[in-house]
Amino acid sequence: MAVGMLAGCGSKTNAPADNQVKEETPATEATAEPATEEAAGPEIPTELEHIKVAYMPNYASLATIVAAEGTGAFEKYGFDVELVEFADGPTIISAMESGSIDYAYIGTGAHKLCVQGRADVICFAQLSNADAVIGNTDMGVNTVEDLKGKKVAYSSGTSSEEILKATLGKANLTMDDIEAVEMDASAITTAMVSGKVDACATWSPNTLTIYNELGDKAVELGANKDFTDTNVSVSSFIAMPDKVKNDRDQVIRFVEAMYAGSDFRNTDFDQ
């Protein structure tokens, strides 16, 4: 808050011949600047707005959303939330473009579509370490080099593709050196466990299922932790560009709810 300050006092002039001293200029109080009001937050609607929020079936995607829901943050900011499950980020963005989803969580790979202008990142979710490339030793895959010429399942446009390319790079291999088998993220686990592919690139909880099912036959060839010096696996919450432009108050309220959920996660992790 601005505080009024006293102006400097006037000084005496040289005494005239009759030794009369001119009066000092009286001190004057400067006009106080008006207090600057804090910017008003978004207006909370009197009735809850129904919104659809897309997620993927893993901890990273759900943790903040569930925390926001469980602590009442969504209701506090005026939302009645319907959660809708998807297998991957690109599919989510396609659904958003059709108007069936309002907000969503995406992993690293789908950020390419944001760069292309198809969606806007509205807030940071977290850094991920859930992606991995897994080989099946029964299929002759023990090292990254063994992937050459092998069938490797991945999901295009997702963090699955990102971790696969990074892992191949460790052995100076590219996608052209393998038999890349593109498939829906939800189908990768079944293909890997059934032996239809020799290796795969996927994320949690698919990775956990594969390790449990294959046991000692599963070998990790690459993971996020191997590339922290060159790659960052970022997850974010997104909205459509038109919504960000035309419904800014609602977007801000959604972000506030997400950050409330994130704060709860950070301070009450055990819950």
Q: What residue ranges belong to the model's regions?
A:
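Pocket-lining segment of extracytoplasmic ligand-binding domains
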Residues: 108-110, 181, 186-271
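Bacterial lipoprotein signal-peptidase II cleavage site
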Residues: 5-21
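Glycine-centered loop/turn positions within well-structured domains
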Residues: 7, 131, 208
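Short, glycine-/small- and polar/acidic-enriched structural segments
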Residues: 23, 30-184, 191, 198-204, ...
